[in-house]
Amino acid sequence: MPKALKFEYKNWENKIAVRTVKPIKIWYGKTEWHSENQWFLKALDLDKNEERDFSIRDILEFL
């Protein structure tokens, strides 16, 4: 299983939070929240216990 990552992330509402995730894959496309094609990190959000798609350009800093 991949190692957990921790990073600061700015969501579509411009709110910044620290996220701890287990990566699943990197993919290119768009989502409901990001209407332009871009790179995403699909990961298991360990705090919410849900799979999420994180826009790579909105990852501010790895911790």
Where on the chain are the PLM-derived regions?
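Short glycine- and basic-residue-enriched patches
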Residues: 1-63
